[in-house]
Amino acid sequence: MKIKASQQAAFEHLLDISVQISKESNIDILMEKILMASVEISNADAGSIYLVNQSKELEFRTVYNDSMGLHLGGSSAEKITFPSVPLFVDDKPNRTAIVAHAANSGEVINIEDVYDALPYDFSAARTMDTKTGYRTKSMLTFPLKDHTDDIVGVIQLINAMEGNEIISFSKQVENQILSFASLGAIALTNKALIFNMEQLFESFAKTIAAAIDAKSPHTGGHCKRVPELTLMIADAVHDYDEGPLATFKLSDEERHQLNIAGWLHDCGKIATPDHVIEKSRKLQTIFDRIHYVSAKLEIASRDIDLAVQDEIIAALKLGKTVQVQQLERKREVAQKQLQLDKAFLLRVNIGGEFLTDEQAQMIHTIATRYQITLDSERQNVLTTNEIDNLSVKRGTLNNEERSIIQKHMDVTLNILEALPFPKHLANVAEYALGHHETMDGKGYPRGLVKAQMSVPARLMAIADVFEALSASDRPYKSAKPVSECLTIMSNMVKNNHLDPDLFTIFVRSKVYEKYIHKFADPKQIDDFNIEAILPTT
């Protein structure tokens, strides 16, 4: 059968429109394109497109009227304020609203003159016509069906035009529109499926982060705050037009990947033992053993009293009253020293300050200064394990526990590399795994150097460190002022741990102020000399 040139041209035009629609990734713009293509194919003067929402209502997404110069929703800056149309009224299908009836019945409704169309309620259209002087006449309403034949939306076209005359929508136009609508519905469904899958994956990532935060009230919120700070830094670098990173620009796709990476950056901690994550004191295991040490010191205190008491009794028997007074002073001095030693151990157990060599030696001295009898065995008041834990230089974790914590990145690596990320999320693993790497290659889990890491991977380390330093929910330290946080980070830059260019932008753009105001105490923002903190070139 020979196809007429006009039909061939129409077919090719329809195909071209369909291709354009299939490439659109923004659902709002996609729906607008479907509507505008329908208006063009039918030569309609006006039209609206609706999407079925979760409340079982038809929600306006784009409204267009050529004669009135009206364009709402979609790419327009004008928002739609019209109320959604319920599909059901009193639990029964809404058959008075024509768009609802088309959705509920799955039927195409072609009306020559809406003023004569019963039983549909066109009172709103009449009222609007009276106010505007417009005349709503012919109308074509048809549902958009997905691959399972479910209704995903409705298109309503108003006033087919032939020159300046309003005519009816012909059967030929109706068939053309339905053919196109099927393609449009498929494109819309595909985009909705992709969007829903992405929402599901992002929600899953956030759920994992929430579960990890819930493991410890002392670090709770870390997995939530890091992604937000990461994006704040990324936006600052994107906008910064000076220095080595002046040409760095973050696409929407890369920004989305960085957001997902932020939520998943510590996912390996789900396998880290709770008592290690929760370790808020140096002697803590399942419980804080400082109470056990205190009990042993109480025994030592009792032993001092008993030993001196025995000496006093012996002196009294010999009538040496002067010696008794000396023994009383001896007991007083010994007990005072014991209380000082106890207070010292309680303080260093917190782990909030760097432990000096002198303090470490003091722990060993205290350990041998007092002996007690336990299980018929005479022993030092502190065990080797207790000495080792109390002697941790910084924080509360000993070497073995720190190794366990670091292994969370191995678990994170295994989890993320096992996930079959689609192309548009291909960089998530690389971004997420960068926050414990260092510029000199001495970090973990892969020991990468700066040149082997992308900018997003390197900036996540800045976010991770600043969040940890500025946090007020760590039990072993109070919230640090910004100046102290940045000074510590500046030293990390000097030691080739953090990226100097990213740190410079972080400081000069004052990202820390925005973050502190949102997630911490504004009182932490203090005065300091920015130039003294910035790395020297």
Where on the chain are the PLM-derived regions?
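GAF sensory/regulatory domain recognition
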Residues: 48-93, 116-117, 288-291, 296, ...
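Helix-loop-beta substructure at the N-terminus of cytosolic sensory domains
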Residues: 23-74, 92-98, 219-220, 227, ...
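Signal-transmission/dimerization alpha-helices at domain junctions
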Residues: 104-108, 154-155, 163, 176-197, ...
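Amphipathic alpha-helical "output/dimerization" segments
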Residues: 13, 150, 165-189, 256, ...
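A short, aliphatic-rich beta-strand micro-motif
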Residues: 137-146, 153
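Signal-transmission linkers at sensory-effector interfaces
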Residues: 1-33, 37-41, 62, 193-207, ...
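Signal-transducing coupling segments at domain and membrane junctions
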Residues: 94-100, 107-108, 112-138, 160-170, ...
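Divalent-cation-assisted or electrostatically stabilized phosphate/pyrophosphate-binding catalytic cores
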Residues: 168-172, 208, 278-303, 385-416, ...
